[in-house]
């Protein structure tokens, strides 16, 4: 691989990681200001459960790109906060399905509004066509590596 390509690759990785971190920090700050006792990591699990609850911890691992110990810890903490509950699967008692509590359902609207607000701030001066190109390129990179 030519040296200049490697440096380009470092740049892309740096920029995407830096942007992702900046968005996460801003969203966390908004959660804190709004009095939501929730980390970005916990929110990402809730986000996937809002899309489809009653999924296994393994499915949460796949959806969030986290390993089993990380998801177990996050679900443990969400359970302590009374935001999720584990229910043994009727088909396979070794599997726990994760369901939202009423308290978690109440957080959905406010937290999603804050997330949308944060993304709007992040993309405020970016033209729509550049956003589309960026999404395409990142999808290709992901597809190449999965």
What are these regions (language model features)?
Residues 1-34:
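N-terminal leader segment of winged-helix/HTH proteins
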Residues 1-7, 128-146:
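C-terminal regulatory/oligomerization modules of transcriptional regulators
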Residues 12, 41-42, 103, 130:
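N-terminal positioning helix adjacent to the helix-turn-helix/winged-helix DNA-binding module
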Residues 19, 23, 30, 64, ...:
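Alpha-helical linker/hinge and terminal dimerization helices associated
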Residues 21, 25-66:
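N-terminal helix-turn-helix DNA-binding core of bacterial DNA-binding proteins
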Residues 40, 53-97:
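Canonical helix-turn-helix DNA-binding module
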Residues 47-48, 62, 109, 135, ...:
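A cross-family signal for key residues in well-ordered alpha-helices
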Residues 76-136:
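Charged, amphipathic alpha-helical coiled-coil/dimerization segments
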